[in-house]
């Protein structure tokens, strides 16, 4: 289990981002999987079982990845957090606008800094053995597979 200090550091660095004011929408089209070559270890919505007891559903997705390969920005945005946290390791949070943010945990190395603008597919760091990714609209987790397939309510047809 994580230490109280690690949990406090995570809460102070990340939780405020859940309710941060929304900037204008910076992305268009579908998002890309940050780990091009990966295998799902824990899927979004999967029920957690500990010691035979059913627990909560996973809000994030954990992927088995190839260490050293690039971790890609899922969509255009601004890096609002890029640092090592005791609880989640090297962590990158990208604000894509309209309240949509991607949270990437467990990177081997960081390649971006806070305040930096990134484009979809740009390397934001190097992958470790596992990547935990969480996509949130405000404080509500979003199924990443729908983002990658451009389906669902986030992909409305804009008036032209």
Segments from the language model and where they lie:
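Conserved, short, structured surface segments that act as functional micro-motifs
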Residues: 92-93, 116-160
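Surface-exposed, glycine-biased beta-strand/turn segments
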Residues: 1-88
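Short histidine-centered loop motifs in beta-beta connectors
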Residues: 98-121, 149
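Short, well-structured beta-strand-loop connectors
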Residues: 70-80, 112-127
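Solvent-exposed coil/turn segments that connect beta secondary-structure elements
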Residues: 45, 68, 84, 97-99, ...
């Amino acid at each position: 289990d994580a230490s109280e200090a690690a949990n406090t550091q995570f809460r102070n660095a990340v939780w405020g981002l859940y309710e941060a004011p929304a900037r204008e929408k910076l992305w268009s089209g579908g998002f890309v999987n940050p780990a091009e070559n990966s295998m799902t270890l824990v899927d979004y919505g999967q029920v957690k079982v500990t010691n035979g007891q059913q627990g909560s559903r996973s809000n994030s997705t954990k992927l088995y990845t190839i260490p050293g390969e690039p971790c890609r920005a899922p969509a255009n945005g601004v890096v609002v957090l890029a640092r090592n946290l005791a609880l989640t390791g090297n962590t990158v949070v990208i604000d894509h606008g309209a309240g949509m943010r991607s949270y990437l945990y467990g990177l081997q190395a960081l390649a971006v800094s806070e305040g930096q603008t990134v484009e979809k597919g740009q390397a934001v760091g190097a992958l470790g053995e596992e990547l935990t990714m969480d996509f949130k609209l405000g404080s509500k987790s979003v199924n990443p597979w729908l983002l990658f397939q451009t389906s669902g309510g986030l992909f409305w047809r804009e008036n032209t």
